[in-house]
């Protein structure tokens, strides 16, 4: 007999050889054995029956019984996935093969998550039709999303994050302290890392005022390298969580390339290893595409994953980051391929609503608008611009 504290109690019964007429009463024999065992004849049970017949025609019954005690399912460790499947088959015989498979999947999902409370409530539900429909929709949606192109997935990630951040700002402002602390002994750099905690925030990234170089130093040379850098007057910051890693704070009037030229010998002999530099804009201006892309990927990956090296299971994230970085390169520092409203230059991809809003503001002030340099109204040709109802004084002059 199995441990009585388990959700499924396994029992084995073997009767003596009985007259053949007893084959019609095997269920009575089973219930009698359950009763004398104290297992409870009224509980849901899964029974495997084997009938043995001897040479004289007498029969013997072998029962392998699994009795289910739902009240014992207080923690998921008291059940196995197979026990849940058997319980569903015993208690839900009316379900079709498809619905039963989906319902088993839902139960296994709660079991794998360790959510015994919801699992027990699901198993006790008298009707599960709506739950099965919901699970089918979830599986379909997930399968549909898996076939999105990378661009579509990037768009979904961005818009979902924007919508959620708007809801959080409006309804549920987050006042909790940030949970991600990287251990750097530089408060400014820590704040910079925390400001880039999602793909969407990387897209909206602004040029940071401070510049840093992150280096990994060989353990055997750690003390001597740190001492040499300090003797050179470099401003260093160390990490309390990761040994043999340090930050060099770059002077405002310099760039990371100047520092790396000084460290060229150490880099070539692999005494130090460059993890990333934060002044990626310099390499865009210097037209170093390869280093710009690789360095940007390393830095953003560290911001999102807190890892200095790429991992193969993050291929999707790396591809999204590569898409963002490449777009910034080809658009000369901007992810968007259009400029802001106050700029003198416009791109055809500029939103028409911004131009219309500019016209409305100009109408309120009765000012003259330079079409070519300010509005580019050719791109909104054919649209009716509403600048006011029955108010003749409100006019815009285009030149």
From Swiss-Prot:
Coiled-coil intervals? none
Quote any Pfam family the record assigns. Baculo_p47
Keyword set, alphabetical order: Host nucleus, Transcription, Transcription regulation
Location in or out of the cell: Host nucleus
Q: Which domain of life is it from?
A: Viruses
Q: Which residues cross the membrane?
A: none
- Name one process (GO BP) from the record: regulation of viral transcription
Predominant place of localization:
host cell
Q: Does the keyword Nucleotide-binding apply?
A: no
InterPro entries, sorted: Baculo_p47
Q: Which GO terms describe its cellular component?
A: host cell nucleus
Function text: It is involved in regulating viral transcription at late times postinfection.
Which family is annotated? Belongs to the baculoviridae p47 family.
Question: What is the designated name of this protein?
Answer: Viral transcription regulator p47
For this protein's source organism, the top of the classification is: Viruses, Viruses incertae sedis, Naldaviricetes, Lefavirales, Baculoviridae
């Amino acid at each position: 007999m199995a441990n009585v504290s388990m959700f499924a109690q396994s029992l084995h019964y073997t009767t003596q050889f009985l007259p053949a007429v007893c084959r019609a009463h095997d269920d009575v024999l089973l219930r009698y054995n359950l009763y004398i065992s104290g297992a409870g004849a009224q509980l849901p049970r899964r029974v495997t029956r084997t009938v043995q017949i001897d040479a004289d025609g007498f029969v013997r019954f072998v029962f392998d019984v699994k009795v289910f005690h739902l009240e014992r399912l207080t923690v998921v460790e008291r059940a196995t996935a197979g026990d849940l499947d058997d319980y569903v088959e015993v208690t839900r015989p009316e379900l079709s093969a498809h619905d039963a498979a989906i319902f088993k999947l839902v139960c296994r999902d709660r079991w794998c998550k360790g959510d015994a409370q919801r699992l027990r409530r699901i198993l006790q539900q008298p009707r599960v039709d709506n739950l099965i429909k919901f699970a089918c929709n979830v599986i379909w949606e997930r399968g549909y999303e898996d076939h999105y192109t990378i661009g579509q997935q990037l768009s979904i990630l961005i818009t979902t994050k924007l919508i959620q951040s708007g809801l959080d700002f409006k309804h549920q402002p987050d006042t909790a302290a940030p949970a991600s602390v990287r251990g750097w002994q530089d408060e400014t750099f820590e704040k910079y890392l925390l400001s880039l905690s999602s793909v969407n925030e990387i897209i909206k990234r602004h040029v940071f005022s401070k510049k840093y170089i992150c280096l990994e130093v060989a353990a055997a040379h750690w003390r001597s390298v740190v001492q040499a850098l300090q003797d050179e007057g470099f401003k260093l910051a160390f990490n309390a969580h990761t040994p043999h890693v340090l930050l060099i704070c770059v002077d405002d009037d310099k760039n990371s390339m100047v520092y790396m030229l000084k460290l060229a010998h150490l880099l070539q002999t692999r005494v130090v290893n460059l993890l990333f530099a934060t002044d990626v804009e310099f390499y865009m201006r210097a037209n170093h595409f390869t280093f710009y892309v690789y360095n940007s990927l390393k830095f953003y990956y560290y911001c999102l994953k807190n890892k200095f090296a790429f991992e193969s299971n993050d291929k999707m994230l790396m591809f999204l980051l590569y898409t963002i970085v490449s777009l910034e390169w080809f658009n000369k520092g901007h992810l968007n391929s259009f400029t802001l409203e106050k700029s003198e230059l416009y791109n055809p991809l500029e939103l028409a609503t911004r131009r219309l809003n500019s016209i409305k503001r100009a109408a309120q002030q009765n000012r003259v608008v330079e079409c070519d340099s300010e509005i580019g109204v050719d791109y909104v040709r054919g649209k009716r611009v509403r600048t006011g109802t029955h108010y003749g004084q409100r006019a815009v002059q285009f030149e």
